[in-house]
Amino acid sequence: VYVLRSVGIPVATDFIISAPEAQGSHSWTVIKDGDGIIPFEYEDGKVTQGYDDKRLKGKIYRQCFGKQKKDITGIMDKPEVPAVLKSPYIKDVTGEYFGENSVEVEIDETECGQYAYLGVFSFPG
């Protein structure tokens, strides 16, 4: 990432916190161009354009150099919020991969706390 940035190529690291079928996180590199993003990974010392690791993906985040403009001050001391989501240096870029989407979830007010986290589940659960 830093080598590409040093020669003026706009590059970033995108990642998933949890893969639906693999129970683990994964990251890869993306180059931003005029048409969007080009995901790639180093394979045998070569950059593979059109990279697709075939992993199912839920939410995709980007590791950023600067603090993002989002208000997370209210969650910093909350143990129920996953630590990775407390970072001011990540942003949700799912829309760059799948387009914009939304979901409505009905929550029983008698059983909910202050936060809800939409996650992915994988076998065995």
Q: Where do the language-model regions lie?
A:
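Acidic surface patches and DE-rich sequence motifs
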Residues: 33, 110, 123
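A short beta-turn/strand-edge loop motif at beta-sheet boundaries
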Residues: 109-115
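Short amphipathic beta-strand segments in non-cytosolic proteins
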Residues: 116-124
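Hydrophobic/aromatic-rich core segments of domains that either
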Residues: 1-78
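Surface-exposed loop/edge segments in extracytoplasmic proteins
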Residues: 38, 124-125
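Beta-strand-rich domain onsets/edges
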Residues: 75-101
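A short, amphipathic beta-strand motif
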Residues: 101-109
